[in-house]
Amino acid sequence: MGEISITKLLVVAALVVLLFGTKKLRTLGGDLGAAIKGFKKAMNDDDAAAKKSAEDTVPAEKLSHKE
């Protein structure tokens, strides 16, 4: 009873297509894809900025202990 079968998935998919229509689903898919692409680009830009910032830092001067 609690199992998800292929027939149940097909019925749900058919209902979604009937409710929203193919054009709306296509638009929604495109918007979702663009959002994921933008998120990945922002993550890569942030990583590149952090790496550049780490490369720009001056290493600390090593001090020797004098007795």
Swiss-Prot record:
Q: Where in the cell is it found?
A: Cell inner membrane
Could you state a single Gene Ontology molecular function term? protein transmembrane transporter activity
**Which ranges of the sequence are coiled-coil?**
none
**Gene Ontology biological process terms in this record:** protein transport by the Tat complex
Q: Which InterPro entries match?
A: TatA/B/E, TatA/E, TatE
Give the bilayer topology: Single-pass membrane protein
Q: Which NCBIfam families match?
A: PRK01614.1, PRK03625.1, tatAE
Described purpose of this protein according to its UniProt entry: Part of the twin-arginine translocation (Tat) system that transports large folded proteins containing a characteristic twin-arginine motif in their signal peptide across membranes. TatE shares overlapping functions with TatA.
- The protein here is known as Probable Sec-independent protein translocase protein TatE
